[in-house]
């Protein structure tokens, strides 16, 4: 989240049980690429006086900075804005690319609703790709901004073991509810039972592309 701070925009995490944003310069749980992108983004906001979103008055522009990474070290950066455009877009992209050569794309998400839901319905690619690729179970998956993928990637190694425990014969129909980008459905398809997946439209779009 992004919010007004004591010394300028705060880009970080919510304090426990509050809507107060704690400015966090680094986090041991995230790749160094994310830290570099945050630094470049914050500098752009400060230098060009881009206002953070203030949820009480519903004023300001920048609501969130959303970054995805993959095992290859690439990053996809999404700026969630209370509007349909950003000022000084070319300078933002230049700074992000300069501090993170592994940047694959920059996406603008428009969220003008009075809500605590992070992402709005509309996306616009400012530069590069609007997706990353990740390899799992010998398959390559496409990850776009809104689609779910296991945050703890090490856990995905359990997929093959879970499939073995299931003892599928190939005659079953398997329902994959809240399927995300279809990792489990497509892993099951190698066995091969019939599988049917359900999720939000953006995730299903990625799942179909992955299939």
Predicted regions and their residues:
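Rossmann-like S-adenosyl-L-methionine
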Residues: 88-211
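SAM-dependent transferase fold signal centered on methyltransferase-like domains
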Residues: 1-124, 136, 157-160, 167-171
């Amino acid at each position: 989240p992004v919010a007004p701070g004591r010394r300028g925009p705060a880009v970080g995490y919510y304090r426990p049980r509050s809507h107060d944003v704690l400015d966090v310069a680094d986090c041991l749980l995230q790749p160094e690429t994310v830290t570099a992108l945050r630094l470049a983004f914050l500098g752009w906001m400060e230098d060009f006086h881009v206002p953070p979103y203030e949820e009480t008055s519903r004023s300001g522009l920048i609501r969130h900075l959303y970054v995805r990474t993959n095992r290859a070290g690439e990053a996809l950066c999404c700026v969630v804005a209370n509007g349909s455009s950003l000022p000084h877009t070319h300078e933002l992209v230049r700074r992000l690319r300069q501090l993170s050569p592994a940047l694959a794309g920059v996406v603008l998400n428009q969220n003008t609703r009075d809500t605590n839901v992070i992402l709005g319905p509309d996306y616009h690619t400012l530069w590069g790709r609007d997706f990353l690729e990740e390899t799992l179970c010998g398959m390559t998956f496409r990850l776009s901004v809104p689609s779910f993928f296991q945050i703890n990637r090490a856990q995905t190694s359990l997929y093959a073991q879970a499939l073995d425990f299931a003892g599928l014969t190939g005659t079953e129909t398997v329902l994959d509810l809240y399927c995300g980008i279809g990792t489990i459905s497509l892993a099951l398809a190698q066995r091969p039972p019939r599988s049917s997946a359900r999720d939000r439209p953006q995730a299903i779009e990625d799942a179909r592309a992955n299939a």
